[in-house]
């Protein structure tokens, strides 16, 4: 294909996307790295100098981030549990997810957002629990304040989410800030959306003081909601993610389809359409759906028709132990019998002429 020299600028956004370097966030591998801070900081491959600097300087924060990886990957797997790609991780791959996230897809957008959110959540929680030397409860929440119910006193331990966001931005964004390509800008946008999502669900909790529990005096504090709320919110953003292209000057995005609105800071953005994830594809990083359990009665993404990509399914007759004939006994216990339950389990057939992966 011959492209006139004057048309190079029109193709630049596409070239930026195609020529994106490997972009996996190496810090995700901190989940699998134990030992001292020096061992951890020096054995996570791919950390940029700023990340290593923060790692050596704040080993307690790194431990919190490492523990948080398990939490946000579990949340990712919960949200994608009924989909062909189920956020499966690869234990021996330092990118954690393999090649699948090299594509600038919706799935990549979600993973970068949920991982960034997970760092904010993990650090903020560790601050409140007194596990970090560099932070504690929110120091700004002192004295008296007013809300719709009247005057209250700040007390207890308000979650210091501003510290969590600040550290997450410095650590997580460090690698992307070194790059000027389209994918780096996409990651930075989705990282920020993830951080903002956690703060969105910060809620005020109060305790009443007074005679017989009356609320003549209130003590209040700010607390993060359960991480599931953040996961559910980002899942909705995933389903409404906006496909974008780079501006000609390479400084920002425009929508790929002019009928859609410009993305806000809360929206997820992506460049490339997702593969169908039906078959094992090493280049795309897809493990396929062969061997995956499907739902014969569903009409959704977990249905055997959709999950198995029209290849059909195998049915196995299995038995499992369940609790049955449960009765309440005064006071205060529920006693159940152990019963064997017979059920059919449906799993997707493998492609007839393909090398396929073990069940995912």
Swiss-Prot record:
Q: Which UniProt keywords apply?
A: Developmental protein, Disulfide bond, Extracellular matrix, Glycoprotein, Lipoprotein, Secreted, Signal, Wnt signaling pathway
Q: Name one GO molecular function term.
A: cytokine activity
Claim: Transport is one of the keywords in the record: no
* CDD domains linked to this entry: Wnt_Wnt2
What subcellular compartments does it reside in?
Secreted, Extracellular space, Extracellular matrix; Secreted
Q: Supply the PROSITE patterns for this chain.
A: WNT1
| Signal peptide annotation | 1-25
Summed up, the tissue specificity of this protein is: In embryos in the developing allantois, pericardium heart, and ventral-lateral mesoderm; in adults in lung, brain, heart and placenta.
User: Which GO cellular component term is one of those annotated?
Assistant: extracellular region
The source's superkingdom equals Eukaryota
Residue positions with a glycan: 295
Which chain regions cross the lipid bilayer?
Answer: none
Swiss-Prot/TrEMBL GO biological process terms: atrial cardiac muscle tissue morphogenesis; canonical Wnt signaling pathway; cardiac epithelial to mesenchymal transition; cardiac muscle cell proliferation; cell proliferation in midbrain; cell-cell signaling; cellular response to transforming growth factor beta stimulus; epithelial cell proliferation
Q: Please name every pair of cysteines joined by a disulfide bond in this record.
A: 76-87, 127-135, 137-157, 206-220, 208-215, 278-309, 294-304, 308-348, 324-339, 326-336, 331-332
Keyword Secreted present in the record's keywords: the answer is: yes
The UniProt record lists lipidation (O-palmitoleoyl serine) at 212
Q: What happens when the gene is disrupted?
A: Nearly complete perinatal lethality within minutes after birth, due to lung hypoplasia. About 4% survive for more than 30 days. Combined disruption of Wnt2 and Wnt2b leads to lung agenesis and loss of trachea development. In contrast, development of liver, stomach, intestine, pancreas and kidneys appears grossly normal.
Instruction: Report the PTM annotation.
Output: Palmitoleoylation is required for efficient binding to frizzled receptors. Depalmitoleoylation leads to Wnt signaling pathway inhibition.
Which InterPro entries did the record assign? Wnt, Wnt2, Wnt_C, Wnt_CS
Q: Which family does it belong to?
A: Belongs to the Wnt family.
Job description of the protein: Ligand for members of the frizzled family of seven transmembrane receptors. Functions in the canonical Wnt/beta-catenin signaling pathway. Functions as a upstream regulator of FGF10 expression. Plays an important role in embryonic lung development. May contribute to embryonic brain development by regulating the proliferation of dopaminergic precursors and neurons.
Q: What protein is this chain from?
A: Protein Wnt-2
Which organism does this record belong to?
Answer: Mus musculus (Mouse)
């Amino acid at each position: 294909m011959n492209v006139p020299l004057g048309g190079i600028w029109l193709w630049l956004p596409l070239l930026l996307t195609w020529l994106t370097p490997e972009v996996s966030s190496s810090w995700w591998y901190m989940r699998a790295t134990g030992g001292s801070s020096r061992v951890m900081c020096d054995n996570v491959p791919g950390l940029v100098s700023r990340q290593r600097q923060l790692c050596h300087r704040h080993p307690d924060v790194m431990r919190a981030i490492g523990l948080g990886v398990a939490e946000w990957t579990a949340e990712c797997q919960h949200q994608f549990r009924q989909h062909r790609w189920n956020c499966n991780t690869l234990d021996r791959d330092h990118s954690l997810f393999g090649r699948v996230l090299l594509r600038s897809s919706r799935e990549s957008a979600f993973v970068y957002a949920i991982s960034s959110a997970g760092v904010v959540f993990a650090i903020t929680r560790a601050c409140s629990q007194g596990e970090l030397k560099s932070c504690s409860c929110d120091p700004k929440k002192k004295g008296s304040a007013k809300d719709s119910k009247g005057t209250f006193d700040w007390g207890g331990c308000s979650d210091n989410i501003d510290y969590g966001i600040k550290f997450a931005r410095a650590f997580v964004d460090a690698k992307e800030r070194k790059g000027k390509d389209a994918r780096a800008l996409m990651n930075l946008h989705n990282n920020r959306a993830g951080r903002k999502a956690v703060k969105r669900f910060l809620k005020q909790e109060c305790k009443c003081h007074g005679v017989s529990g009356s609320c003549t005096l209130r003590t209040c504090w700010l607390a993060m909601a359960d991480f599931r709320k953040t996961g559910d919110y980002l899942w909705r953003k995933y389903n409404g993610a906006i496909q974008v292209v780079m501006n000609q000057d390479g400084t920002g995005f425009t929508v790929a389809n002019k009928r859609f609105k410009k993305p806000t800071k809360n929206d997820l953005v992506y460049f490339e359409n997702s593969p169908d994830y039906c078959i094992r594809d090493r280049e795309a990083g897809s493990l396929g759906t062969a061997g995956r359990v499907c739902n014969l009665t569903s009409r959704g993404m977990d249905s055997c028709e959709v999950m198995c990509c029209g290849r059909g399914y195998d049915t196995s007759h299995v038995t499992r132990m369940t609790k049955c004939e449960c009765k309440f006994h005064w006071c205060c216990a529920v006693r159940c019998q152990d019963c064997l339950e017979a059920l059919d389990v449906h799993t997707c057939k493998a492609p007839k002429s393909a090398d396929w992966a073990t069940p995912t």
